[in-house]
Amino acid sequence: MPGRRKTLFTLVVLFASGCHGWGGGPGTDTVEILSEKPSPNGRFIATSFYCEGGGAAGYCYWNASLRRAGDEVDQRDGLLGKHKTWKGFSDIKLRWIDGSNLEIACRQAKSEAYRDHVSEKVESRHGIRIHYILTN
């Protein structure tokens, strides 16, 4: 019996360590930059992007970000939606109104399943006010 326990323990440890990376995560995401628009003063960059990842469970989504020039895009710091790895927005277009106002036009999911998710949008970041236009 002790030999079986040792074998079972060894198998559990090997399985658990082998599955560690299967869940994906931000480091395994594939991010495609669709559009980048620098602010009029060049201090900020608005970006629309597509992201996929998540390992076996998988996800893909479109979103937008606003970052300081020189910073990398953080796909988990999107401006659109409550859950940062959910779909819910598409056809994202960016336009600077002026140096302190950014306009984001996009299509928004209408399904009841997305109601809570699409209800949240970041209103400002880095002192930039963000205006949303829904195109559907």
Region locations from a protein language model:
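Acidic, small-residue rich beta-repeat scaffolds with periodic aromatic anchors
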Residues: G21, G81-N136
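N-terminal secretory signal peptides
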Residues: G27-S65
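N-terminal export leaders
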Residues: T7-L8
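N-terminal secretory signal peptides that target proteins for export/translocation
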Residues: M1-P2
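Mature extracytoplasmic domains of secretory-pathway proteins
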Residues: E52-E103
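C-terminal motif of bacterial Sec signal peptides marking the signal peptidase cleavage site
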Residues: S17-G18
